[in-house]
Structures are given as structure tokens and as C-alpha cells.
Amino acid sequence: AMLLTHAQTALAGSEESRFKKPLKTITRDAGYPAAPAFSKSPYSDIITKYAKSYGVPVDLAHAVVRVESNFNPKARGSAGEVGLMQIKPATARAMGYRGKTKGLYDPETNIRYGMKYLSKAHELGGGETCGTILRYNAGHGAKRMNPISKRYCGKVIAMIGN
């Protein structure tokens, strides 16, 4: 058996308390910016305007744009998704867009139609975050969570906290 001196026991105790304290400050959004960081986006006014106009929670709207494009209006996805909200041209047309694909790179146009789609996803998801993300990411008709949408929802929850 190992015998510890009083000094070693005291040291072990102080080591333990030293490591316990920082853990209390770590939150599940570690590694993601807090919601106020969204206000630094050059598109936050447009995002907020359309989120409010379509009844989408503003923090959710900002989180979706961040996950989709990291606020890059020139982003292009591998399946033809375009712009800030990575909307497919066919999806934008289903939401009433009548222009050319390149018009969807315009931040306001992209957010207008992307937010309209997100609003419907939010409604279909019953206002629940992961239900909304599933339907935005996998299509309005999606019913079962998939690994990609689950990861996406995890990122959004880490950013907005619910």
C-alpha cells in the first residue's frame, strides 16, 4: 500500500480544486460565438428584418446563416446551393423567386427567399429548433432526423442555447 504524507495529500487536494473550478465555466457553447457575435455580421440587419417579417426567431435565423455560409454571400454548395442561406434555385422559385440563379447571390434576395423557406420549416417543425433545422436542411417533407441534420442542429443549439 502506498502511504501519502500530509504534504502530498494537501497537494493532491489543491490540485483537485484547481482543476474543478475551470470546468464550471465551460459551457456547451464553448467553441462557438455567443449570440451577440451575430450582430457583427454585415448582414445582421437584413437577417433580422426578414426573420421578424416571416416569424422566425432572430437568433435561430442568424445561426442558420452562420452554419450555412459563415456569412459569405458568395458561398456555393456542392448540390447547387447558393449564397448566404445556401438556397437551391428551385427552392427559391418554389418560394416565389422569379430571377436568374446569379440573382440569389445578392444578400437581400437570398435572405428574403431563404428566410421564407426557413419560416415554413419552422412552422412544420412546430417551432422546435431541431424540427426546424431538419426541415430546412433535408426538405420540408422530412420527418426523421438524419446524421447531417442532427449535427447541424447541434451547431445551432450551441450558438443559441436551446
Where do the protein language model's features map onto the residues?
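Catalytic and substrate-binding regions of cell-wall glycan-acting enzymes that process beta-1,4-linked
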Residues: 132-162
